[in-house]
């Protein structure tokens, strides 16, 4: 009985090929390197997923760098100044 139940759950959580194509197409729109290519250029789903992971890593690095810069800026201004309050709000 539990085997049957797990198969039903497994089938229910799977996405269809059409859903996968739609998701990959949506991801493609967010990737600058792939989005700039002509629509006629075929890009595999695995390439889109790989580029998505690379792009997310790049965005994480940019966020880290910006946080570091804001922290440095915060250290250079008066703690009670309006500028410091704005910087603190950006870091939160």
Swiss-Prot record:
<feature type="domain" description="bHLH">
    <location>
        <begin position="4"/>
        <end position="59"/>
    </location>
</feature>
<keyword id="KW-0939">Gibberellin signaling pathway</keyword>
<keyword id="KW-0341">Growth regulation</keyword>
<dbReference type="InterPro" id="IPR044293">
    <property type="entry name" value="PRE"/>
</dbReference>
<dbReference type="GO" id="GO:0005634">
    <property type="term" value="C:nucleus"/>
</dbReference>
<comment type="function">
    <text>Atypical and probable non DNA-binding bHLH transcription factor that integrates multiple signaling pathways to regulate cell elongation and plant development. May have a regulatory role in various aspects of gibberellin-dependent growth and development.</text>
</comment>
<dbReference type="Pfam" id="PF23174">
    <property type="entry name" value="bHLH_ILI"/>
</dbReference>
<keyword id="KW-0539">Nucleus</keyword>
<dbReference type="GO" id="GO:0040008">
    <property type="term" value="P:regulation of growth"/>
</dbReference>
<dbReference type="GO" id="GO:0009740">
    <property type="term" value="P:gibberellic acid mediated signaling pathway"/>
</dbReference>
<dbReference type="GO" id="GO:0006355">
    <property type="term" value="P:regulation of DNA-templated transcription"/>
</dbReference>
<keyword id="KW-0805">Transcription regulation</keyword>
<dbReference type="InterPro" id="IPR011598">
    <property type="entry name" value="bHLH_dom"/>
</dbReference>
<comment type="subunit">
    <text>Interacts with IBH1.</text>
</comment>
<dbReference type="GO" id="GO:0046983">
    <property type="term" value="F:protein dimerization activity"/>
</dbReference>
<protein>
    <recommendedName>
        <fullName>Transcription factor PRE5</fullName>
    </recommendedName>
</protein>
<dbReference type="InterPro" id="IPR036638">
    <property type="entry name" value="HLH_DNA-bd_sf"/>
</dbReference>
<comment type="similarity">
    <text>Belongs to the bHLH protein family.</text>
</comment>
<keyword id="KW-0804">Transcription</keyword>
């Amino acid at each position: 009985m539990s085997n049957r139940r797990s198969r039903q759950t497994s089938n229910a959580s799977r996405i269809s090929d059409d859903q996968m194509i739609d998701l990959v197409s949506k991801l493609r729109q967010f990737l600058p390197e792939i989005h700039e290519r002509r629509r006629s250029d075929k890009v595999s789903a695995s390439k889109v997923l790989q580029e998505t992971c690379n792009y997310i890593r790049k965005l994480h690095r940019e966020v880290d760098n910006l946080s570091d810069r804001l922290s440095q800026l915060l250290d250079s201004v008066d703690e009670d100044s309006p500028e410091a309050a704005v910087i603190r709000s950006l870091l939160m």
